[in-house]
Structures are given as C-alpha cells and as structure tokens.
Amino acid sequence: MEDERQVELDCISAIFPEIVLDPNEPFTATIDLPVNPRNPVKVYFPASADGAIQTPLHTPPRSVASGHEDGQGVADHANNVESHNLSYLPSLQLHIILPEGYPATYAPKFELATSPAWLSREYLDELQANGECMWEEADHSEIVFGYIDSLQQAAENAFGYGEGKVLEIPQEYKIALLDYDIKATQAAFEKETFDCGVCLGKTACMRALYLTNIY
C-alpha cells in the first residue's frame, strides 16, 4: 500500500510544480512562496543618530513619516528614518517534513525563513505553530495544501504589513530589499505584452514603451 505521505506530496507537486522534493530525505520538500502584496508596503529603515543599525520592529501601527506613492525613498530627518514603498518582498521559504506516523499520529513539521530576514524569527515561529494548530483542528488529517494556501493568503497583504502594521528593517538589509524589488518589478513588467495595431502583433512592454501608437 502506498504511503499516505507520498500520495499527499505527489498531489502537492501537481498543484505547485515549483516545489522541490528532497531526493535524500523522503517525505521532505521545499517551496519558495512569493510575497507580492496587493498594495505596496511602506518599509522603514531606521538608523540611530550615531549611525548605528537598529534592530527591526514588528509592532502595531504607530505614527511614522510617510513615503511617496511612487516607491522613491523618503527621509524623516527628525526621527532619522528612511522609507520606501516596495511592491515585492523576498519570498517566504517553506521547508516541509512529513514524519513517520503523519497524518494520523504526528503533525507535519514546517520550517519558515526569509533571506534577508525581513520577517522576525518570533513571527515566523508563530506561523510555524499555526501549522500544528491546523492539523489538530483538521482531526489529524492531511493539511499541507491548506497550510501553503494560508501562507499565500497572508502574503497578499504582506503578513499584515500591508494593512497598517509598521515594518522596520535594519539598514544593513536595505540594499538587498530595494534590489529585489527592482528586479522583481522589472521581471513582471517584461512578461506583459500589448496588442499593437500598427505592428500587427503582440509587443513586449519594454519595446511598447517607445511606441507612441500604444494607448
């Protein structure tokens, strides 16, 4: 009889072709979940007066300097805070381990990370714990798809940071995050095409920028 874990992983692989199964560790897989919020997220990069890097804050909403809607950085000199609106944040890395006895006896093990660490370890631990809660609520049945789906839904609003929560990240990560946002935005832009009545064909966005007949 085929192992339930293998059946579930086969189904997950069919739904998410990008998932990577570990050839050396049976019933283990990894998937990167994109974080492309519905609305740009304002990210603050604070620095102390002496230039020292501050630790990230993941707190309820509070009053901070606002940034421009075009994604350009804004410096709040009074509070020594620089802000940027980002449309893309580094993906959430999910490592899945289905132990022997899953799903009937043991819960799946989920390990989460981001690189760079723009989400706090404390918050990632909370997300990981949600997986076991889902397994308990599902009466010890298969929940890998449901867990991935819950993370994808949370990513749509940047795990709450797209809805007013303040996201502060150390200056040491600023270049990496801005570079990621620029490259991801460019990649998404290049995938788009337009129907051109003059060229009589589809024209990629990068080229369409220079066509005055595109409206």
What name fits each language-model region?
Residues 21-136:
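Compact alpha/beta protein-protein interaction domains typified by the UBC
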Residues 15-18, 22, 100, 104, ...:
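Short amphipathic alpha-helical interaction elements and helix-loop-helix interfaces
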Residues 2-6, 85-88, 118-122, 138-145, ...:
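Intrinsic disorder
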Residues 1-22:
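Eukaryotic proteins' extreme N-terminal regulatory segments
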Residues 154-213:
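Proximal pre-RING flanking segment of RING-type E3 ubiquitin ligases
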Residues 130-164:
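Acidic, low-complexity intrinsically disordered segments
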Residues 7, 24-28, 89-91, 105, ...:
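Eukaryote-biased feature marking scaffold/signaling PDZ-domain proteins and nuclear chromatin regulators
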